[in-house]
Amino acid sequence: VWKHLRALAYQQHPYQWMTIGKELAHIEEAQLEDVKAFFKKHYNPQNAVVCVAGNCSFEEVVALAKKWFEPIPAGEKYIRNIAPEPAQTAARHLEVHADVPSDALYMAWHIAPRLDPSYYATDIITEIMGHGNASRLYQKLVKEQQLFSSIQCYHTGSVEAGLLVIDGKI
């Protein structure tokens, strides 16, 4: 479902593809040098974050970080230059027929990026609308109207413009 939903929601942005790639062929056809270049570009100290929790001092953490990470070459600074997804100006629909355990309905709307101040309102709305059996969607559409066997509302929480999703199993 997510493969179809992402491709429907995003026309230009890389979010239209799953993290592993657009098609399995991308992985199958990758050459060892391609994989090494990708690893070198994305998995280096210049692009890393280290989080430490526990019973240790700042000085201990710095000493251990220097011991284990300082010998690793920093790598080139990687700056993503991705154009934002153009505004969606019309509804997009897709109906998929497949041999699945239950029918489902997925609806999605574009939302602000995670660092936008309005993101927090979206987070609260999705909790009220579709998180758990006490949520408004569950009470109305599962309990009262019995249109769905389950329903939820959530957001993708993406760094760039994400999606608010409602999905229901029929």
What spans do the regions from the language model cover?
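Charge-rich, well-structured scaffold segments of protease-associated domains
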Residues: 1-77, 95, 113, 121, ...
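His/Glu-based metal-binding/catalytic segments typifying zinc-dependent metallopeptidases
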Residues: 7, 77-136
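Short amphipathic alpha-helix segments
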Residues: 136-144
